[in-house]
Amino acid sequence: MNYLRHVLPPVIIALAFGALSNTPAQPDTKIVVERIEPSKLDELINDKDCQCLVVAMAAWCGPCREELPTLIKLNDKYKDQGLKMIGISLDMGGPQAMQPIVETLGVNFPVYWAGEEAIYKYDVIAMPTLFLVKNGEIVERIVGKRSEAFLDEKIRDLLR
């Protein structure tokens, strides 16, 4: 009995550390959703040297949340080829409404909160809405969640 009292605690501790080391890590994100003024948003989108994919989304939007992993994957694939992906949160609750989703999913592109004003300015009628921007001009608007293959093709076309 005395033997178990000395041997059992180190064994339990070793097993606990072993179990914890196999726990999958949460996605590490350094993206902080910040408020953006309309003029600054225009600067980002109207950059003449940029091929951008701008994602209008909201935390409460199920299709937006479902599409984010695809966008994260495509951003990884194309960011070194000149794609600039920008997320625009249209939540009424401010930047903090989208932050938990950005952290949980490990979003790897900047996300800004633009609020209700951007809904009217960019004529967003449904979410998600993606804007393909080339040389400062919106060349295509994609409304609704789309497949990875569809978006991949659109991004390849944009980068040509």
What are these regions (language model features)?
Residues 125-126, 131-160:
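Non-catalytic, surface beta->alpha helical segment in thiol-disulfide oxidoreductase systems
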Residues 1-35, 141, 152, 160:
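N-terminal targeting signals for export/organelle localization
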Residues 102-134:
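Short, internal strand/loop/helix patches
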Residues 56-73:
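Conserved redox-active cysteine motifs that mediate thiol-disulfide chemistry
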Residues 49-52, 56-60, 126:
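Short pre-active-site segment immediately N-terminal to redox-active cysteine/selenocysteine motifs
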Residues 31-52:
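A short beta-strand-turn-helix
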Residues 53-54, 85, 130:
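Hydrophobic beta-strand anchors of alpha/beta hydrolase catalytic cores
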Residues 82-96, 107-116:
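Thiol-based oxidoreductase modules, predominantly thioredoxin-like and allied folds used
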